[in-house]
């Protein structure tokens, strides 16, 4: 959908419903809202839509609409492991509501798993509780719906001690990321190569040592091309790099959206190495973490398949004074339960879990403060000061 068409729909939705839709919302959100505006008052609707809106910030407008402007009767979420559509890994929910304002003390039936007629779990959630809930997928509680949030936004959170940022998006890993040995054979200059971690599925360890050059001591050492020189200077001073870059044209790589926005086009996003990373997606049930936390002692950065955790002021100062505590920090990250990680993240069809930087930042960091009270001394005041 073009930007112009999305703006037209946003304006139309606001005119007809008063709802301000986030630009990241999927087309189904506009469709549901506009179709409901067309409905007769008192009419009943049943929708089968992706359940992602129940978890994400850009779903807040639809959740608010369902809680405040119509009477939500039932929400049935299918078990993400039970894929409903063979050609789409999407988690699904059936919504049933009446186009009338909700009565006082209204409760909504939430069901999970199985079928509409024979769900695996059922609960009745007061509307007021829904209005205060960031994530609706925590309802109803069930062994397979193991999505529990611990942080209520008032206690210490990982975001108080780490700046969480996605790794770099190169635009074409197959071109920009090379084996270290291959880069050497091509004669590419070391000064314009940076160590980078392999894809999480190829990283078999959660503790990475370093060699003398800052490369991780793992089976396959990789590097990413990252050069800030304009093309004439590369051509004049680094002929091997220039020859390699010329192959991008015949491969059609320079036509990519992300690459086309960069100047020069072979300059990567800038990230410093960090001692801690978290994989961005994964699977896991019960207490098993769907994501892995990595202790990185090399100078390697990560691609956008990783979240990079940069220690903030108090934690960074403690680690500077006591470098030996980095291992304990990694151990505490490894103790975050799979339930909480899934609760703060989002789940897709087939049971694939993902977590964004803001979601990881909301994970409770109470164990950090219990072990090192000094790092939590002014967390609340800093949060109020900087939001």
Where are these regions (language model features)?
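Signature of N6-adenine DNA methyltransferases within the class I
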Residues: 1-176
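Polybasic, glycine- and aromatic-enriched phosphate-binding surface used to engage nucleic acids
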Residues: 146-386
């Amino acid at each position: 959908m073009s930007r112009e068409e999305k703006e037209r729909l946003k304006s139309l939705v606001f005119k007809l419903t008063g709802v301000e839709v986030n630009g990241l919302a999927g087309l189904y959100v506009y469709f549901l809202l506009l179709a409901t505006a067309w409905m007769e008052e008192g009419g009943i609707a049943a929708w089968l839509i992706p359940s992602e809106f129940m978890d994400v910030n850009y779903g807040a407008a639809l959740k608010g609409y369902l809680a405040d402007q119509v009477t939500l009767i039932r929400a049935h979420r299918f078990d993400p492991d039970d894929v409903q559509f063979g050609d789409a890994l999407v988690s699904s929910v059936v919504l049933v509501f009446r186009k009338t304002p909700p009565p006082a003390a209204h409760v909504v039936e939430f069901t999970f798993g199985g079928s509409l007629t024979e769900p695996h779990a059922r609960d009745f959630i007061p509307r007021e509780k829904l209005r205060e809930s960031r994530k609706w997928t925590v309802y109803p509680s069930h062994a397979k719906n193991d999505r529990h949030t611990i942080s209520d936004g008032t206690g210490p959170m990982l975001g108080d001690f780490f700046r969480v940022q996605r790794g770099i998006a190169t635009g074409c890993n197959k071109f920009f990321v090379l084996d270290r040995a291959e880069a050497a054979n091509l004669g590419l200059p070391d000064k314009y190569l940076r160590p980078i971690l392999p894809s999480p599925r190829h990283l078999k360890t959660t503790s990475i040592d370093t060699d003398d050059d800052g490369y991780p001591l793992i089976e396959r050492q990789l590097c990413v091309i990252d050069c800030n020189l304009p093309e004439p200077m590369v051509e004049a001073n680094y002929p091997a790099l220039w020859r390699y870059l010329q192959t991008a044209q015949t491969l059609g790589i320079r036509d990519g959206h992300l690459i086309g926005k960069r100047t020069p086009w072979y300059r990567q996003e800038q990230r410093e190495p960090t001692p801690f990373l978290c994989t961005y997606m994964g699977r896991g049930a019960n207490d098993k973490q769907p994501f892995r936390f990595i202790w990185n002692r090399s100078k390697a950065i990560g691609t956008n398949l990783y979240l990079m955790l940069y220690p903030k002021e108090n934690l960074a100062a403690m680690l500077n004074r006591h470098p030996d505590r980095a291992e304990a920090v990694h151990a505490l990250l490894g103790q975050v339960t799979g339930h909480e990680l899934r609760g703060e993240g989002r789940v897709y069809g087939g049971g694939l879990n993902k977590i964004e930087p803001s979601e990881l930042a909301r994970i409770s960091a109470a164990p950090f403060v219990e072990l090192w009270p000094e790092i939590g001394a002014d967390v609340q005041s800093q949060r109020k000061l900087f939001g």
